Amino acid sequence: MRGDKATIPDIELEELVLPANLISDESLSPDATAEEEFCPYRIDSKCHNCGCRIRVTVAATEFGIRCFEQLLLKELCLFCPACSRQLPRNGRS
């Protein structure tokens, strides 16, 4: 606008472009949902009972393998096949 008073030629209107969700509270769905892939992981550890080497191969997502890692570091122990046959299962022989 130029001058003291607004006249029709002085008013410039431009089209305002807004995303659809701002106008009607709709959410835009993502084009492709990224699903995590299951990848193979090889875990080398030691038997909790006799100390022999154990290798376990699993397929997991990145989140899954990180959770499994935390379990192995804090609350979960692995046994070799020989030791697992000698241990009682859930209080049974």
Swiss-Prot record:
Domain of life the protein comes from: Viruses
Chain positions of motif Nuclear export signal: 65-73
Keywords linked to the UniProt accession: Activator, DNA-binding, Early protein, G1/S host cell cycle checkpoint dysregulation by virus, Host cytoplasm, Host nucleus, Host-virus interaction, Inhibition of host innate immune response by virus, Inhibition of host interferon signaling pathway by virus, Interferon antiviral system evasion, Metal-binding, Modulation of host cell cycle by virus, Oncogene, Transcription, Transcription regulation, Viral immunoevasion, Zinc, Zinc-finger
E7 terminal domain: annotated span: 1-39
Entry text on domains: The E7 terminal domain is an intrinsically disordered domain, whose flexibility and conformational transitions confer target adaptability to the oncoprotein. It allows adaptation to a variety of protein targets and exposes the PEST degradation sequence that regulates its turnover in the cell.
Matching HAMAP family: PPV_E7
UniProt-recorded name of the protein: Protein E7
